[in-house]
A protein has these predicted regions:
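Conserved phosphate/ATP/ADP-binding segment of small-molecule kinases
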Residues: 174-177, 183-235
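Glycine-rich phosphate/adenosyl-contacting loop at the front of the ribokinase-like
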Residues: 1-78
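Anion (oxyanion) recognition and catalysis
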Residues: 69, 95, 172-173, 229
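Conserved phosphate-binding/catalytic loop of the ribokinase/pfkB sugar-kinase fold
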Residues: 102-105, 115-158
């Protein structure tokens, strides 16, 4: 099934540190998994200059679209990036992976998830969302969607109800299947009311793991599967 994804556009960066000084400079606790701000992200990027690193386009939906392209499906990805080299890299990497990029662009630096690897091997993760979650419904056009049979949306975007609801409405109007990934049980707990509303109305395909299914239904996994299967075509 030809599928277009909608998710947070984040570049995954792995950086091998010569020492742990940068962690103290940036204000991240060693071994932590933290959200970081733009000032911290700029400090990290300056510290990367000349150090061994690797990077890849990331974000759960983007990774899924890349996998689908490898399997031969037509795949696209909608996201929002900044006007910097990281955003340029993200766009070019998707093209090389045969995933069509549909990016809204803004001034500033793009989002990224940076894994800082200390000399002793311990990993510290800092995620800077940047412009990724600020994409608006108006930046997602019917022209983008009409070339596909399905849209795949990550649950992390539920923080933007207008974006998710409006995009689902556009997709259904055009005859697309709507697939939703619940993403995390904390997301389910935070947006249970919204999920109760949009899943029966718009969602055809629902992805969840055991903990997410239990959080959504309030039932044990084997019972949760039955309930979910009654609400959507595929779960």
């Amino acid at each position: 099934m030809n599928t277009i994804g909608l998710g947070n556009a984040l570049v995954d960066v792995l950086l091998k540190l010569e020492n742990d000084d940068v962690l103290a400079e940036v204000g991240i606790q060693k071994g932590a998994m933290d959200m970081i701000n733009q000032e911290q992200m700029i400090k990290i990027r300056k510290s990367q200059e000349g150090l061994e690193r690797s990077q890849a386009p990331g974000g759960s939906v983007c990774n899924t679209m890349r996998a689908m392209a490898i399997l031969g499906a037509k795949a696209g990805f909608i996201g929002k990036i900044g006007s910097d080299s990281v955003g340029e890299y993200y766009e070019e990497a998707l093209k090389k992976a045969n995933v069509s990029p549909y990016f809204a662009k803004t001034d500033g630096i793009s989002g990224s998830c940076t894994v800082l690897i200390s000399p002793d091997g311990e990993r510290t993760m800092g995620t800077f969302l940047g412009p990724a979650p600020t994409i608006t419904p108006d930046e997602i056009t019917e022209e983008m969607l009409s070339a596909y049979q399905c849209i795949y949306i990550e649950g992390y975007l539920l923080v933007n109800e207008e974006l998710v609801r409006t995009t689902m409405q556009k997709a259904k109007k055009l005859g697309l299947k709507v697939a939703l990934d619940l993403s995390n049980f904390n997301i389910v707990n935070a947006f249970r009311g919204l999920l109760d509303d949009i899943i029966p109305e718009y969602v055809d395909i629902l992805f969840s793991n055991e903990s997410e299914a239990e959080a959504f239904t309030g039932l044990k996994a084997h019972e949760a599967v039955k309930v979910l299967s009654e609400q959507v075509e595929i779960s």
